[in-house]
Regions:
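Short hydrophobic/alpha-helical segments at membrane-entry points of transmembrane helices
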Residues: 90-96
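Cytoplasmic helix-loop-helix junction between adjacent transmembrane helices
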Residues: 96-133
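Extracytoplasmic
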Residues: 1-35, 53-56, 142-143
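Short hydrophobic/small-residue motifs within alpha-helical transmembrane segments
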Residues: 45-47, 136-137
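Conserved MFS/SLC helix-loop-helix module at the cytosolic interface between two early adjacent transmembrane helices
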Residues: 51-90
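Helix-loop-helix hairpin linking two adjacent transmembrane segments in secondary transporters
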Residues: 122, 130-158
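Juxtamembrane helix-start elements in MFS-like secondary transporters
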Residues: 33-42, 128
Length: 158
């Protein structure tokens, strides 16, 4: 369970936040976006996430965490795939604020914390700490992986 949590934290935070700035130059040159607009995408993302956290948090107390995480992973994957079709700032913003926000809250920090706290009676804090390593680890690894792939396959395929 701890490794699953680590992998989910790595994926959700890594792709949305640590890989995104690496792609900025391509979005600026190809789609004419500004750095300010791209920065606001990440900032605005937290508005629906904050609202959804209350709703999803309550639902996680009633329903299966595993099912929420699986559905969230599918939604998140659809959101990442959808990014390859963006053609404007507004399409990027829409995907981040809807599909990615919903998918990430269903499989990210909130769900991971619930999953681990349900699994461990003792040492839950340690288990949560180990899972949280995925966040930092993704910040080191993903930019190093994504950057060379951009030149190799293009930003829409990364």
């Amino acid at each position: 369970m701890v490794f699953t949590g680590l992998a989910l934290e790595f994926t959700v935070v890594g792709f949305l936040f640590y890989s995104f700035p690496v792609i900025w130059p391509y979005l600026i040159s190809e789609l004419g976006m500004t750095e300010s607009q791209l920065g606001m995408v990440s900032a605005f993302y937290f508005i629906p996430v904050a609202i959804l956290a209350i709703i999803i948090g309550r639902a996680l107390d009633k329903y299966s965490v595993k099912n929420f995480m699986m559905i969230g992973a599918i939604i998140y994957a659809v959101g990442l795939f959808s990014l390859s079709f963006i053609n404007s700032y507004w399409s990027l913003l829409t995907i981040y604020l809807t599909i990615l926000a919903l998918g990430s809250i269903m499989m990210g920090n909130l769900a991971v914390a619930k999953l681990i706290s349900n699994w461990f009676d003792k040492n839950a804090g340690r288990a949560l700490g180990i899972a949280a390593i995925g966040i930092s680890f993704s910040g080191v690894v993903l930019p190093l992986v994504v950057d060379p792939l951009l030149d190799l396959v293009g930003w829409r395929n990364v």
